[in-house]
Amino acid sequence: REIGMLFQGSALFDSKNVGENVKFPLDILTETPEKEKLEKVNHCLELVGLNKVNQKMPSELSGGMKKRVGIARAIVNDSKYLFCDEPNSGLDPLTAIKIDDLILELTQKLKTTTIVVTHDMNSVVEIGEYIMFLHEGKKLWEGNNKKILKTNIKELNEFVFSNKLMKKIK
């Protein structure tokens, strides 16, 4: 209950509509009255910009919309922590940026601690306030997004400068 989870593949129930998917944690973890649950669901869908799709089925949604539904479900419990596993997996670059912006905005608005597991360097730089770099299960580096570009750790540099744009910056 302390942790809201955004799964890599969104993990929506195909047999439930958007509203039911978002409400699911409330149904299994709380004894909140139904009216209150629906108000929370609508509020969370509004926060992620999907307040008009609560009756749609997951099969009717784009990948970005599914991620937003997953985010709404992850925050519906007012959790202290939000854990995002590869939130940009399977998204086009523009949608990935929008999801990063949304995660950062919600982290600040809801005053939650957000942990993001990612291999997307854009996400690291854009939403990473405090970054920990793990390689083969070991912590090799930690710091902020300004210092990550100035490190001399070979494995981290290979990750940071793995795409052509970042190589040009270096």
Predicted feature locations:
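A short, proline-enriched helix->beta-strand linker immediately N-terminal to the Walker B motif
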Residues: 76-80
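Helix N-cap at the start of a conserved alpha-helix in ABC-type nucleotide-binding domains
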Residues: 93-95
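C-terminal boundary and immediately downstream tail of ABC-type ATPase nucleotide-binding domains
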Residues: 146-170
